[in-house]
Amino acid sequence: ARLGINAISTCEEAFFPWNSNPTITKEIDDLAKKNGCTISGSGYQDIYWGQLISSIAGSTQTIKKIKGSSSYNVEDYGIALAKAHGAGLSLEDFDKEIASIDRMTDEERQKLINSGEYLPSYMWNVNGWLCSKLGLTVTSQTQKCIPQTYKEDIVSSTLETTVKAGDATGMSAVVTTNTKEGIVIESE
């Protein structure tokens, strides 16, 4: 942004970072505006959870709840994503290392967001973007990471190991957003 060069990132948080790190987002936004360039995020979310959902919502007379899920194979996205999703962890380790992070009060979460230390799941920013696009006012938002398992052992070339039956093969991040307008968005 300092050099006035347009940039686009596939970082999931960059899609709509206003609800996970507003301070740094404002700094980047102000710098980009000052230097006449655009800094943006893009990828899976803007098509399937952004434009598609907002287009369908725009053609609907009444909405009470938007609920949906998406899935992908962590094997296709490399070691960093596989580890961030808890692939290969026992359920006990998944709970300690992944799921426990979300067990906090709204005040604790907001403090982390304001300090720029919050680590959102891949759906957190989508819900914020969708509310912004639809003109909804967020009153609360939570996330819960749930381990996904399989009944048989699975060989993981990404992890270079065999994930045992019943251990985490990845996760589902369920993000629930309540709005002043009474519409609930639940994505995973």
Name the predicted role of every residue range.
Residues 7-10, 39-42, 67-68, 140-141:
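General beta-strand structural signal in soluble alpha/beta enzymes
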Residues 25-29, 54, 127:
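Short amphipathic alpha-helical segments and helix-helix/interface helices
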Residues 11-15, 44-45, 71:
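Short, ordered loop/turn segments at secondary-structure junctions
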Residues 58-188:
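Active-site-lining helix/loop region of Rossmann-like oxidoreductase modules
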